[in-house]
């Protein structure tokens, strides 16, 4: 089923944007791991809306209620289930949209797939709201990985045409690792922040939206993790990335840029650092043959512009069979790239932990 994923670490998500709650069930966690709930809360706040004028004013407490699998501060080893209540919904904003298909959304595809029984309010089960559950699960997986010496970090690589530097070219410093989570727009080159803010606010002023890219790195991962072909590190992470609404592309290392290189440029020269084998460059993103080589796993994800915009758009009324003009009301993000970072990190943590445990 589409709501389930995993081999050793199995997750199952449920709920709709305007339902009573959303939630997740996590199976396969080892017993006795102490979960820092403050760290979980910090991750949830990074994804939550309403932090500034760069995101939707819709505010949700996003406080997970753990129902099972957690006792006296530690995992029990049985399925860990949690829900997150939906407290700030305006379903009336969607009453007129039952038959009018919103461009860029899954209204039409969901209606067809579920024979018109889908909950269309706020996108229902297709909503980015559901990613709050993924962030909760990922926050736990991140803590387990950190106990193994593995850290996952990310930054905004681009907003529109404004580009930040890359993890492939810049050393990921302890200063960045310790501070990026507290920033609304985590960047390597902080001089780009003002231009990115202006780009987002310009899209908002024009009743439009804008997309961008996020670059993610897995640090401290040992060589030999993963499998060739169908269960490769790339296919595992790509599977999870494309489960995030708005993700439309992924590339590992230099990705598509490799197509413009010669083999002598693309190949990462190897050398010894003590007993470790490292590479002088990381063009392949720390993965060869679907298996980690000991270098940081680095990949970039493309986030499309928010589909809900206040500009008029041409669409269809599926009930009357007529073409019509859609004018959307409600509370929407001019850009979701900055809110996608913790979701991408969370999905990465789930995938990497599953690969290690499996």
Report residues per predicted region.
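Internal helix-turn-beta structural module
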Residues: 10, 82, 306-358
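A short glycine/serine-rich beta->alpha loop
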Residues: 10-15, 118-130, 223-227, 282-287, ...
């Amino acid at each position: 089923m589409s709501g389930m994923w995993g081999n050793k670490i199995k997750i199952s998500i449920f709920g709709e944007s305007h339902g009573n709650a959303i939630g997740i069930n996590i199976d396969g966690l080892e017993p006795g791991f102490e979960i820092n709930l403050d760290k979980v809360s910090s991750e949830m706040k990074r994804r939550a809306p309403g932090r500034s004028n760069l995101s939707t004013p819709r505010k949700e407490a996003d406080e997970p209620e753990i129902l099972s699998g957690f006792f006296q501060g530690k995992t029990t080893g049985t399925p860990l289930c949690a829900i997150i209540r939906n407290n700030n919904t305006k379903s009336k904003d969607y009453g007129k949209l039952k038959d009018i298909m919103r461009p860029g959304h899954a209204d039409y595809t969901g209606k067809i797939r579920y024979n018109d029984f889908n909950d269309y309010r706020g996108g229902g089960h297709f909503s980015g709201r559901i990613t709050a559950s993924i962030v909760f699960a990922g926050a736990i997986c991140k803590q387990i990985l950190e106990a193994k010496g593995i850290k996952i970090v990310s930054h905004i690589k681009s907003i529109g045409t404004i580009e930040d530097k890359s993890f492939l070219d810049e050393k990921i410093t302890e200063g960045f690792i310790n501070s990026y989570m507290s920033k609304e727009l985590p960047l390597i080159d902080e001089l780009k922040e003002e231009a990115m803010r202006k780009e987002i606010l310009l899209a908002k002023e024009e009743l439009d939206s804008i997309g961008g890219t996020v670059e993610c790195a897995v640090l401290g991962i040992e060589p030999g993790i993963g499998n060739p072909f169908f269960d490769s590190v790339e296919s595992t992470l790509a599977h999870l990335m494309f489960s995030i609404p708005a993700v439309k592309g992924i590339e590992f290392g230099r990705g598509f840029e490799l197509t413009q290189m010669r083999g002598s440029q693309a190949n990462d020269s190897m050398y010894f650092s003590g007993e470790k084998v490292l590479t002088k460059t990381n063009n392949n993103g720390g993965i060869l043959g679907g298996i980690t080589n000991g270098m940081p796993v680095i990949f970039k994800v493309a986030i499309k512009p928010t589909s809900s915009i206040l500009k008029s758009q041409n669409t269809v009324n599926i009930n009357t069979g007529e073409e019509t003009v859609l004018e959307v009301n409600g509370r929407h993000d001019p850009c979701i790239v900055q809110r996608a970072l913790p979701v991408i990190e969370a999905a990465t943590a789930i995938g990497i932990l599953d690969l290690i445990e499996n």
